[in-house]
């Protein structure tokens, strides 16, 4: 566990602080570093628990400190190819991420959930199912969901279960991380500003199963080309789910029913309208994945179904906010890539006024615009990508576009545009 080694933690966000705390508990010599010139060493020190012995450096890292480092822990937001990391890698310094560091302290079993979209909903639902079966004190929900693995790993025991939402950024820096159940919900273009190529992004997602064996399970989406292809190469035993195709082995949707099939023998598990509070086909897929994961952990279907029936939308994910003046307001602000945003539009059943925009992740918007298909009444755009999105929309013949500089202005425009029979979804 890096005891006695001089460890550099790069990044002073919540993941970096968690890593520094865990390293100190395990008697490493810690340097907490942030390259921001807007911070000082004292700012970093203030983020750590009182009594921390970690050295804290902001701005430029002194060469003598860099050359003394024996291991480096990267926060998820730190690219693996920055000059500092490249220099240390060339010197043979051990490079790992917060997830790998947490796993080194893990004592129990791990479930790891990744995918372009649906991670948080599936992870949250899976966590609730595990709590219901194994107990709240034996279940830890960690990772990209906002709770660093490193803050929970040393609380685990041989009979505990850790459920992790793992991003592609976090998967770039794993080496021994070994979940007993993994899941890749889907893979569509995203974060290409970080990964540069689709091939690199896919490889990062597939890494979640890299240390698994056939004794382990990997839950995969049959309807997604990338994950279906991986089923044939996966080192774990693949378990498939589909919302479009009936499967001889796996979980699938037939009409309103989720069915489990084992060698063609079918078992009806639930009704998506009577037993689910979530909206949208994307959430049916998330529920199927959670069922597959839970059954892989030997949780009885009765327990699974009880939790699903009481489960509501995760904040910011096709989340119903309110009805005001006859207009339904939905918050889908976690739909931060075109495919996720498409799912939000599909979930709407009436004409929609849509807010879009944000920072540029080098995404293509053609399929998103095509998904409007008469449902989107008007598009209100904001942020760095608004002109790029508007140009794409006009190319596809959609010209009902308005611009806003603030979210307050967005909401005012949407309210003006909406009518009593219409919905608005914010993303």
Q: What residue spans do the PLM features occupy?
A:
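N-terminal leader/targeting and accessory segments in enzymes
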Residues: 1-97, 101
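Short internal beta-strands
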Residues: 29-36, 218-222, 355-356, 375-384
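Beta-strand->loop->alpha-helix junctions that form or flank phosphate-binding loops
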Residues: 34, 58-60, 96-100, 142, ...
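C-terminal helical cap/extension that packs against the catalytic core
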Residues: 42-54, 366-420
């Amino acid at each position: 566990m890096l005891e006695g080694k001089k460890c550099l933690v790069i990044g002073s966000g919540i993941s970096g602080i968690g890593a520094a705390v865990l390293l100190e508990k395990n008697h490493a010599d810690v340097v907490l570093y942030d390259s921001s010139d807007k911070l000082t060493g004292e700012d970093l020190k203030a983020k750590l628990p009182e009594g921390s012995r970690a050295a804290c450096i902001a701005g430029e890292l002194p060469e003598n400190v860099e050359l003394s480092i024996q291991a480096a822990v990267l926060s998820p937001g730190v690219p693996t190819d920055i000059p500092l990391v490249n220099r240390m890698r060339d010197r043979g310094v051990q490079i790992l991420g917060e997830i790998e560091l947490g796993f080194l302290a893990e004592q129990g079993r791990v479930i790891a959930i990744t995918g372009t979209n649906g991670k948080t909903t599936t992870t949250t639902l899976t966590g609730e199912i595990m709590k219901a079966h194994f107990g709240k004190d034996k279940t830890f929900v960690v990772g990209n969901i906002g709770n660093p693995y490193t803050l929970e790993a040393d609380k685990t025991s041989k009979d505990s279960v850790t459920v992790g939402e793992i991003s592609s950024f976090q998967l770039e820096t794993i080496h021994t991380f070994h979940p007993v159940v993994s899941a890749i919900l889907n893979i569509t273009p995203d974060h290409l500003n970080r990964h540069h190529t689709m091939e690199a992004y896919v490889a990062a997602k597939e890494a979640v199963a890299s240390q698994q064996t056939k004794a382990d399970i990997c839950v995969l989406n049959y309807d997604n080309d990338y994950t279906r292809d991986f089923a044939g190469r996966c080192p774990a035993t693949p378990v498939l789910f589909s919302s479009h195709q009936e499967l001889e082995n796996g979980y699938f949707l037939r009409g309103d029913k989720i069915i489990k099939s084992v060698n063609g023998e079918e078992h009806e598990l639930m009704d998506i309208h009577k037993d689910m509070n979530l909206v949208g086909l994307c959430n049916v897929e998330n529920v199927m994945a959670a069922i597959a994961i839970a059954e892989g952990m030997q949780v009885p279907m009765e327990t699974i179904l009880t939790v699903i029936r009481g489960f509501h939308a995760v904040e910011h994910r096709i989340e119903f906010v309110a009805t005001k003046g006859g207009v339904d307001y939905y918050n889908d602000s976690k739909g931060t890539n075109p495919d996720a945003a498409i799912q939000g539009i599909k979930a709407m059943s009436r004409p929609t006024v849509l807010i879009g925009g944000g920072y540029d992740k080098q995404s293509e918007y053609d399929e998103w615009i095509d998904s409007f298909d008469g449902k989107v009444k008007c598009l209100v755009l904001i942020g760095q990508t608004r002109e790029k999105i508007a140009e794409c929309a006009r190319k596809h013949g959609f010209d009902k576009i308005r611009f806003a500089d603030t979210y307050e202005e967005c909401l005012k425009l949407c309210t003006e545009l909406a009518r009593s029979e219409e919905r608005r979804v914010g993303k």
